[in-house]
Amino acid sequence: MTEPAFTSFINLAADRLGAETVLCSDDFFAKKENLLKPGRGIFIPGKYTDRGKWMDGWESRRKRTGGHDWCIIQLATPGIIHGVDIDTNHFLGNHPPHASIEACYIQNTKKIKWPKIE
């Protein structure tokens, strides 16, 4: 299989370059930080954690109510996004039917003050 053209660009979401997962709706089964690992996910039969089957990706609990899962990723550096690879390899039967991507550019994130809403 031929790789998409955008894979020749720098991966702005690479943890080795400083990208970080900031927050997510739920990562009970598999941590959000796995989203930033390089390469395709792997599957290891028989490997389990105290929360269930070990998965090399981000996995939340199934929802019994409406809504969706989300994850905020701070890219390593500002840049132009030429493409996104949402790898659901090994998540057969437990993958989203669709996904959306939103982006914003915020300068000086260390100086942002979050007000408490009461």
Which positions does each model-derived feature cover?
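Juxtadomain low-complexity/linker regions and immediately adjacent membrane-anchoring helices
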Residues: M1-T65, H90-E118
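Helix-boundary capping/turn motifs
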Residues: D50, Q74-G79
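Extracellular structured ligand-interaction cores
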Residues: H68-W70, I81, P96-H98
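Residue-level recognition of well-ordered beta-strand positions that form the cores
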Residues: Q74, D85-D87, E102
